Amino acid sequence: MKYTELKDKSVAELNALLKEKKVLLFTLRQKLKTMQLSNPNEISAVRKEIAQINTAISATRQGA
């Protein structure tokens, strides 16, 4: 998901999306530990998405 798509969402939607991505990150880390994850690069992609969501939440709260 691109940052421009995140800017248009409300804080409640962003928080729900953030929670979903954190659960996904947890699941991916568990799969990595049990050697079930075929593509470890997914973890960094999800971490990047979480950072983008946090940035969008901060920008929305500050009124930017």
Curated annotation (Swiss-Prot):
InterPro entries: Ribosomal_uL29 (IPR001854), Ribosomal_uL29_CS (IPR018254), Ribosomal_uL29_sf (IPR036049). The keyword Magnesium does not apply. One of its GO terms (cellular component) is ribosome. It comes from the Bacteria. The keyword Cell inner membrane does not apply. One of its GO terms (molecular function) is structural constituent of ribosome. Keywords: Ribonucleoprotein, Ribosomal protein. Coiled coil: none annotated. SUPFAM superfamilies: Ribosomal protein L29 (L29p) (SSF46561). GO terms for biological process: translation. NCBIfam families: L29. Belongs to the universal ribosomal protein uL29 family. This is Large ribosomal subunit protein uL29. It comes from Campylobacter concisus (strain 13826). The lineage of its organism: Bacteria, Pseudomonadati, Campylobacterota, Epsilonproteobacteria, Campylobacterales.
